Amino acid sequence: MRLQPSLLLLALLLLKVTTIQATLGNNSWEEQTWPEGLKNFPFPCRPEEIPFSPPSESVHSLRISDIRVVGAIGNLETTPDAKMVLKRQKWIERNQMQTCMQVMTVLSDFIKKFSPSVLPLLCPSREKVLPRMRNEDLGPQARELVQHMKKNQKLNFRNDWKLINVFFNAQSQCHPCSSSQKEGNMTSSMQELIRLLDYLQKEVPKAFVNLVDISELGNSIQSNNQENGPRDINEVCECPQEPSRLTTAVQRWYYQNSWEKLLTSGRYDTKDTFTVIYQSFLHEMEPSVFPIKQTSGSSLKKLSTALAVSLWNGMIDPTGKKEEFFTTGQRIPVKCPTQKHPYLFTYRNNNKLSSTPEIKRISETREGTEIRCPDMDPSNAVPTSVHHLRPADIKVIGALGDSLTAGNGAGSTPGNILDVLTQYRGLSWSIGGNENISTVTTLANILREFNPSLIGFSTGTGNQNSAAAFLNQAVAGATSETLPSQARRLVDLMKENKRINFQDDWKIVTLFIGGNDLCDSCSDPPRYSSQNFTAHIGKALDILHAEVPRVFVNLVTVLSIVSLRELYQEESINCPRVILRSLCPCVLKFKDNSTELTTLIELNKQYQEETHRLVDSGRYDTRDDFTVVLQPFLEQVPMPKTPEGLPDSSFFAPDCFHFHSKAHARVARSLWNNMLEPVGEKKKEENLENIVDLICPSESQPYLRTYKNSNYTYPTATPTSSPKPDYGSQLWCEDRAPSASFPTSVHALKPADIQVVAAVGDSLTAGNGIGSKPDDLPDVITQYRGLSYSAGGDASLESVTTLPNILREFNMNLTGFAVGVGSADDANAFLNQAVPGAKAEGLKKQVQTLVQKMKSDPRINFQRDWKVITLLIGTTDLCDYCTDSNLYSATNFSAYLRDALDFLHREVPRALVNLVDFMNPIIFRQVFLGNQDKCPMTQACSLCNCLLTVREDSPELARMKEVVKVYQTKIRELVESGRYDTREDFTIVLQPFLEEVKLAFQDGIPDVSFFAPDCIHPNQKFHSQLSRALWNNMLQPLGKKMDFLDLTADTTLSCPSLEEPFLRTYRNSNYTYPANPAIENWGSDFLCPEQGSSNSAPSSVHQLRPADIKVVAALGDSLTTAVGAGAKNNSNWSTAWRGLSWSIGGDGTLETHTTLPNILKKFNPHLHGFSTGTQEEAAGLNVAVEGAIAQDMPSQARILVDRMKNSSEINLDQDWKLITIFVGSNDLCQYCENPEAHSVKNYVQSLQQALDIFYKELPRAFINVVEIMELVGLRQIQGEKCAVTTQSICPCFGRSLDNSPELQEMKNINRHFQSGSSLITYHHQYMEREDFAVVVQPFFQSTVVPLDDKGKPDLSFFSVDCFHFSERGHAEMAIALWNNMLEPVGQKQTYNNFTHSRTKVKCPTSENPYFFTMRNSGLLRKEASHKTPSVPFWAVLVAAAASFIVGVVLVMLWRTKKCSRREERPISLVATVF
């Protein structure tokens, strides 16, 4: 027997705990012997080198050898973190006690080297450790520890030296939540600790107390389990301000600094026999730094050892000079006492405590300036080109970025570290507007000298949401990932502000980001790659470029951040290094000249180079009123120095990280000067030590410099490069005004009334490959959402033709469109929620997400705004149709589409939905196969297997063409049903322009210039035509809409007419939906590929294909004899129309009559046994009898066996037989009149007896047992035309009152009948033979009465007696039974779906060509046959129930495993069609 690893680990853990645990005294405290794994710890100290001396009388000359006992108070819990792996968090909580023991064991073992007689360590017992221990909980532990030491006979309490460690977690304490708190303030939690220390000082003589802050222990444990570092203190303490790394670092520093100040004050040094030392766990640590041989030991043990080593070193090192930081890969050295310093360091005996006097900070007076230029006037006329923009033309200023733009600490007084949390936005270099230029130098104040009416600048203090921040939307602690959302908010603020003329005012926006990305880059290199960095910037710029007219964007490149190390490493400067390390670990934690530092420096350069490349691409110079100019003055900025050559901290806030107002002023000067320097000649190195003069625009060049007015050519451009194609359009409409009064009807909706645009669908709508270069196949995965025909909003209509850009010509305040590139989750995707590779099945999720976004977005008035939503789906379903014709059937496609549209209809007010007919995949088959030298032929299978890999003129291709037509028909039927025209403010309009696509040809070959490199996705050239066709379709009346798209046509954009100014709907088109065509018959279309029988007749029922069935038969009552199935009036309603019977009828063909035999005849035309007509002589093997009950089943079974044996057409031994049993309705209907005769027990026993006969007499048999339906629904069926009433034909259900106990009892009995028939099929006896199977088919388990359009029972499914089924009902039962047979046991549909469709018949698949049984469904293992004695029926039920439960569990496991396999598959959008 093999022991599972998890069980082995548990066993060893229990063994270890049992072995090491012992007790002292009253079991309140626990000791631990030395763990085996730590005995080989490389301890370097040599006690014999320290001269012997008698025990010390003073704690300030205490040696290690003097310590007699080691104890601990508190626990080593970690602060829970929402992102921490839950299992690991729980494991840590369970092992807090063990951690304390391990830490104290290591420490005790160190001490034993010097003091062999030291007593066993003391830790609180498990019972005393609370799961969330706070400082106030430590008091009882302290008192118990003192009592234990007093009672311990091995310890001289008055004279022996004691080492007591008080563990607490500063991170779990509530620090001040605002910078208004003074540093000296103590929280109540700190006061609790002080009371504890006061108690120890009073009660415990001769004690050295370590106050151990283990905050970073939790962070070290969590560092391997989360991305964003330690849990923020604001979250723990519920502080109102937003959590940030800066807040966490500053507040933790505040707490630790407060303790240091208190302890160095001498409060606990009033006696020579007692002292308290503050010890902080090492800031960052990995297992690799532990001086332990790397074995399979737990990381928790390693962390415990690290904490012990940290404590040891803290006692040996001079206080205030402790080693605070170890880098990745650096091992922690174990410090040793020396002859010169053999004692434990205290605050009193530390002659190094008084640090080197701080270098005096240079004056921090704010720097004003002045600017006197000869020409400070605006242009004579408001310029239309950004390349002719004077400073005085700027009317609006904005900024994006991080805390350097937010102004954190810019106005803080020296030493006030808490105040660094304050965001002095009014002093910010790029947008601050405090006072004026004479006292505060900022870009905004400089521009105000040219235009005093400038708006947008920030003043005072506050975060980005404060009113004073205005258009300074920088977020403290931000990385480049947040830029798109910042840009989005900035645009919205500019649009909403009434003081800003959004269309006409010239705006300047400064963007500066990257420091925090670099500071975190080593923790997640892929996340902070240069590619991602510039991609995030690109997305933000895309938003500005797409939406904001008249903008000059300053893109300031990231500074060279490595110079920060100079400030950190200079010991003479009093910087809070704990804060610096927390804020920027990747810059500070590595050694000089290390590989890691070199990597950081290289990444810094890549950030700068990639930013240059982004701007040099010219992608933001496609309009005359927009440009992005790179301002590189910070790229090589050196650390400013004092006259003594030391880093000048006066340029920095008290945290030595953020800029002080002095630096802000110098940087503002440099930015201004950079803006007036020609592109290509801008300064990249600015020495902040020097106060530079502000330059003026020259007479010859009075403009802010751009690439064009600098006569600059981007390096990436080549003289021979062809000009970028123009895909814009002209709109010549005169009337672009909205309705005179806000419309309330969707049928009176003008284009200018549309305020919101949205889209859902697949990769065509997501924009895959639209902007890809012809030879760049991998780029097809890029989602160019801003160029998408129905939802893109890049640039304007002049250069990019999309539906939103057309609508923006009518309403410039349109919202919802996407810009740039990215996934549906990106902010710039907005309401383009299309997902690449999406199928109809996932459409409802898309519309749910869309609606949620519309409801929650402040830019959208969900109830009032008019919306246009465009939906296109279906191509991907068709491309996968041949892989599973059941899953991708037209019926399922229609159902999924209906669910999504129903949701929109139900949830969204004021909406016009464009339902665009999908693009026929036959089109790109032509393109793909016609350009085999240009298209990726090797990817044909993954791109669209069902169409690209089949032969021309093959049956498979013909079948696919038919399926395409059925899909299109389903879409049209759905819209024309009128179900979405029940409200005045909602409609769905079918836009059919893609029904037929005329390709462009070159030399007789389809022109690939309209397609992306995969020859599948349309490129921008194609999308432009799609946009024009969609728009024109929207203006064409129903019944006259263009149903084709000519890619070669020079399509112009239509305009609403004066007579018809509205977007066209069925009503304003005076259109009447065509009446549904009369249904000629209830037949079905057979769309399954040709599938023959097995190569040889199978010997196993678990490998039985439909074509293997030679004989069909049935048992049952009047529902199987088909009483009334073909009746047209009361005169013949009692006739048995056996030829139409769902399970055994064989009249006509499948195309005219849907029955199980007619389906089977498509696989085997030589099928025997089915019944025809109405005469009993033609009943075949239909032995059902009208009025039969379960007790009749054994006799029917006997009759059937005899008929088979006597038939000359049947080879009893060799022919495979399919028998369907359906009985029980009469038993239920008569149950209340004779419960004993019609009991569940009798019902099940009768079924078992019939099955036993078949099992004994019939070889090669597959038995369908159909669960009885829920008869309570029959009560709904009533009408004047009904020949009989439910009361008379089924009294037990018809006579009971609604909600009566009698009716409820009958419902229960009904369920028991279902359960009984289901469980009996699990009898082990029926699983013993390889050629016999009984399978329950549960499609009636939850019976749904079909309803008509008015919500009443649809009597077309019932015969004239309103009880038996009509031919339509029999057809639906046949389809449900057949489909059940092709569904795995445990996954069968358990309800009837009686909706008409000729394509609902499922097909066997190549993966699953057999009828499903228990075994081939994966629920049973193949076992050797063996005989078992007969058992009582109720024992069978118990066994069957157990088997059923096991089966359900197995199914769940199988499905989970299957789903997990699906999830593990890599996603390749290149290999995903639409």
UniProtKB/Swiss-Prot annotation:
Keywords for the protein's UniProt record, in alphabetical order: Cell membrane, Glycoprotein, Hydrolase, Lipid metabolism, Membrane, Phospholipid metabolism, Repeat, Signal, Transmembrane, Transmembrane helix
GO BP annotations listed: phospholipid metabolic process
Gene Ontology terms: cellular component: apical plasma membrane; brush border membrane
Subcellular compartments: Apical cell membrane
Keyword Repeat recorded: yes
4 X 308-326 AA approximate repeats as annotated region, ranges: 36-1417
Enzyme class: hydrolase
Reactions catalysed: a 1,2-diacyl-sn-glycero-3-phosphocholine + H2O = a 1-acyl-sn-glycero-3-phosphocholine + a fatty acid + H(+); a 1-O-alkyl-2-acyl-sn-glycero-3-phosphocholine + H2O = a 1-O-alkyl-sn-glycero-3-phosphocholine + a fatty acid + H(+); a 1-acyl-sn-glycero-3-phosphocholine + H2O = sn-glycerol 3-phosphocholine + a fatty acid + H(+); a triacylglycerol + H2O = a diacylglycerol + a fatty acid + H(+)
Subcellular location, principal: membrane
Superkingdom: Eukaryota
Active site per UniProt: 403, 517, 658
Bilayer-spanning residue ranges: 1433-1453
Topological type in the membrane: Single-pass type I membrane protein
Glycosylated residues (UniProt): 185, 436, 532, 593, 711, 813, 892, 1070, 1129, 1206, 1393
Gene3D superfamilies associated with the record: SGNH hydrolase (3.40.50.1110)
EC number of the protein: 3.1.1.5, 3.1.1.4, 3.1.1.3
Keyword Transcription regulation attributed: no
Record-linked InterPro entries: GDSL (IPR001087), Lipase_GDSL_AS (IPR008265), Phospholipase_B (IPR035547), PLB1 (IPR038885), SGNH_hydro_sf (IPR036514)
PROSITE patterns attached to this UniProt entry: LIPASE_GDSL_SER
Segments on the Cytoplasmic side according to the record's topology features: 1454-1474
Region: Necessary for membrane localization, residue numbers: 1418-1461
Signal peptide annotation: 1-22
UniProt similarity note: Belongs to the 'GDSL' lipolytic enzyme family. Phospholipase B1 subfamily.
Comment text on domains: Repeat 2 contains the catalytic domain.
Record's function text: Calcium-independent membrane-associated phospholipase that catalyzes complete diacylation of phospholipids by hydrolyzing both sn-1 and sn-2 fatty acyl chains attached to the glycerol backbone (phospholipase B activity). Has dual phospholipase and lysophospholipase activities toward diacylphospholipids. Preferentially cleaves sn-2 ester bonds over sn-1 bonds. Acts as a lipase toward glycerolipid substrates. Hydrolyzes fatty acyl chains of diacylglycerols with preference for the sn-2 position and of triacylglycerols with not positional selectivity.
Stated name of the protein: Phospholipase B1, membrane-associated
Lineage of the organism: Eukaryota, Metazoa, Chordata, Craniata, Vertebrata
Name of the gene: PLB1
